[in-house]
């Protein structure tokens, strides 16, 4: 992995090596229920969340951005990825991703067919990293799995939308569409689950423009109000329903 790639990941996804930004908590520690509870209680105060469920949802969005978005971006743009195992990952005090020394490696497609390489990379990502993290967040906070997995899907939609808006090279657009279709149509085996937990939430292109709203609410609006009042996400289903109700009243 050259320095240009690492600088891109640092700039776009807040990914740092351990010597650049020390860790606050290793993700392996977060998988311990007692330590996870302690961390969520601290994080809840940091972001001014009213309860553990809101804190867990916000943390899942952040972690998906750091790990999932960066991986999918790398697959499209660089045709390679950082091998982000649970053991390699930690969060800094600033809630950026700290990659621990000696526990990561860059993986190119190399001699493998890209489809075979992609399946191995994404199975490792979702089944051994994302799924365990979401499971412990659910267990500790009782936030529904559907919210957590849609948080992941929203990050996927977002990173692909941004690449399509900026990246015009046909080979990369082809990779993106292929990767999206693979994720959309993957079986539950990719996630070590009975069913694909994100397929109903994935959207790109015209479908995303026509129907941008989420199916579940990430609970962001429950964070402490700022000077502008309650803050809803742009794709918030609650905000959308309120708008529809007002429009019906005006008719």
What function would you assign to each model-found segment?
Residues 1-58:
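Generic N-terminal leader/targeting and pre-domain segments
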Residues 5, 9-13, 23, 80-87, ...:
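Generic structural motif recognizing short loop/turn segments at the entrances and edges of beta-strands
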Residues 14, 24, 29-32, 108, ...:
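Acidic-enriched, low-complexity/disordered segments with a strong bias for Aspartate over Glutamate
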Residues 26, 67, 156, 222, ...:
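Generic short alpha-helical hydrophobic face used as a protein-protein interaction/packing hotspot
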Residues 39, 47-209:
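Hydrophobic, aromatic-lined core segments that form the binding pocket/scaffold
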Residues 174-251:
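Cys/His-clustered metal-coordination modules, chiefly Zn-binding fingers
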């Amino acid at each position: 992995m050259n320095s240009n790639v690492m600088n891109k990941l640092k700039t776009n996804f807040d990914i740092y090596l351990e010597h650049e930004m020390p860790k606050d908590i290793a993700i392996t520690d977060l998988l311990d229920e007692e330590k996870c509870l302690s961390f969520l209680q601290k994080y809840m105060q940091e972001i001014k969340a009213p309860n553990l469920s809101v804190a867990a949802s916000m943390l899942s969005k952040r972690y998906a951005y750091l790990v999932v978005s960066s991986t999918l971006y790398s697959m499209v743009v660089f045709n390679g990825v950082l091998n982000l195992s649970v053991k390699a990952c930690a969060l800094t005090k600033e809630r950026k991703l700290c990659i621990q020394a000696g526990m990561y490696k860059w993986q190119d497609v190399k001699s493998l067919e890209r489809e075979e390489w992609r399946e191995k990379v994404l199975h490792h990502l979702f089944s051994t990293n994302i799924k365990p993290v979401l499971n412990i967040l659910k267990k500790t906070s009782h936030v529904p799995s559907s919210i957590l997995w849609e948080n992941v899907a929203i990050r996927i939609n977002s990173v692909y939308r941004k690449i399509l808006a900026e990246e015009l090279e046909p080979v990369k657009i082809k990779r993106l569409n292929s990767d999206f279709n693979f994720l959309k149509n993957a079986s539950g085996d990719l996630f070590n689950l009975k069913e694909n937990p994100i397929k109903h939430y994935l959207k790109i292109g015209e479908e995303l423009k026509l129907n941008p709203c989420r199916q579940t609410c990430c609970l962001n609006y429950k964070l402490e109000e700022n000077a502008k009042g309650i803050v809803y996400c742009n794709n918030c289903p609650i905000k959308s329903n309120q708008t529809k109700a007002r429009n019906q009243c005006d008719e």
